[in-house]
Amino acid sequence: MQAQRTLRRLPRLALIPLLFATAATHAATDPLAPTAHWSAYTAGRATTPPMGWSSWNAFGTNIDEEKIMGAAQRIVDSGLAAKGYRYINIDDGWALRRHQPDNRLEARPDRFPSTVNGGFRPFTDKLHAMGLKAGIYSDLGRNTCSQAYGGDDPNLPKGSMLEREVGLYGHIDQDITLFFRDWGFDFFKVDGCGVRAYGADSPKVKTGNYRALKPVLDLESVARSDIPAVQAEFTQINDALKRSNPDGDFLLSLCVWGAGDVRAWGKNFGNISRTSDDIRPQWSRLLSNLDSAVRRELYGHPGSWNDPDMLFIGAGDFDANHLVEAKSHFSLWAMLNSPLMTGADLRTTPQALIDIFGNADIIALNQDPAGNQAVLAYDADDLEILVKTLASGDKAVAVFNRGFAAVDADLTADHLKLRKDAPIKLTDLWSKADTTFTNETKVHVAPRETRIFRVQGTRALAQGVYLSEQPGSVNPAVDGVTTPQADPTVFRSSFGWTGTKGGGERPMYAGWGGARADSTPYGQLLQIAGTPYAAGIGILANSRLEVRNGDYRRIEAHVGVDDSARDRTHAVTFMIYGDGKLLAKSKPLRWGQPAQALSADVGGAKIVELVAKSTGGVNEQLPVTWGGAALLSSAQAR
């Protein structure tokens, strides 16, 4: 949640044994060694992105049982529940105090009458009886975001200093047991302001009303974030969730707003992970939040999704007077496999917006079981084309006009990785109109509009699939980044928490140089020794990719050092493993040398691993390309 707060590191007496154990394990293990294991997060219940409603955008801390049950009832009555919207999430503002001396959390009975006899169980029972699930909010630190930035908010926790410490810090097992075993919640959002905003120099701490907690997160500086400490606390949270939910029926939301390089590691610690600061109901904030996730297609998978924040449809630039923008917002979030969490006051939301939330054809793209986030097939400042491969073999394409002038965009078979000489059918998922073309067509896109289509055609790769078509099955277990750097491609909005004070928003979300589909880590076209590759994976040297194989029998690629590399000296060796066994290995390859064809029989292997190894250089100066990397259904070479 709110992320204009400053974090550094937290006292770690309780974490030291865990950190030492983790460090010892890491030191004893070569991160490039094959594991025959899919390492991205698969616990909990998020094989498809979660859908539902959250209280924050509409109400902030001014929440009560009537408002939340009103939203739940509208979700059921409107048919949205039947379409997959099932989580009803209470955000910040519910906690009254931490009772002393037993440290048990108490809700606000004046706002939530059903809690008057000791807790939320009657509330969650009612939601469950409606066929819905219930979510609750907490923070990594002692205190929450509203306490850090809420001013004189009357809805803040009450009582002594200790009673007002309603965050998880020091109470992880107790609180999670309370939330899940005793109160019956299903969804857990964990914010990070409590480990960011309460340093000794904080005005809040200086008042004497809050205890100091040395920060471990800094939104503006990944270098000042203590990433191992944050990861250690999320590990403890995961362990507690598993103990309290032996059936695995939970969903964990990481909300550290893209800070601390979480865009790289969040996929290993939770079901959804925020890639940016909070969204706001302004067009420029949509662009910022979109950009924080749109080039992270290899970092979102079934069970661990990128989260550019909640839908803000229903307010500002996305209200009922801005249906073009509202439809774009919904279409883009669906293509990104973002959680579809509405944030409007659904009791008064116009039917036109309910109809947007309820577009079943677009929901189907978001909930497609293949779990492939859309990949940028065309990437420019004013127009983008995003393509998603579906489990059925169909495609989806979104043509997004970011700007203020209409565009007649060229959509080609190459964008879609379909044959140029065969008919291609487009079904507009808003108008439901069908069109057919061969090779290429024009798509008229109004300002701020997203034209979104389901696509049927003949695959360019008839007997297989390019790895870049199935990012949901490709995990950069080790992406080669050694020094996380802020990503300069994220749009810098003027509508941040400080408005136009200061010098403007600067790049802040680490992830620059991460693995990419159909692109180098730094946004260049894939190319080895002058030969371009329209399909492939770009990643840094000293990296390891995990690939879920399915029933494919062969893998092929052309490998080499990408032409964009600044390191013209050091060699890279490429290896293919199947279930931990070395299947193929290249000769050492340097910049300027032609690509080497590398292939292997992977029939029967569940996990294929692609390793690019080098010594002596700087990974960030040595991007490599797995050109045309594809899984094939035939054991014969293409």
Sequence positions of predicted segments:
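Gly-Asp-aromatic-enriched flexible segments
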Residues: 458-638
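Glycan-recognition surfaces
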Residues: 242-345, 366, 379
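N-terminal module-boundary/linker segments of secreted carbohydrate-active enzymes
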Residues: 28-65, 69, 74, 216-221, ...
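Structural recognition of the beta-strand scaffold that forms the well-ordered cores
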Residues: 49-55, 84-91, 133-138, 186-191, ...
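Aromatic-lined carbohydrate-binding/catalytic grooves of carbohydrate-active enzymes
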Residues: 71-216
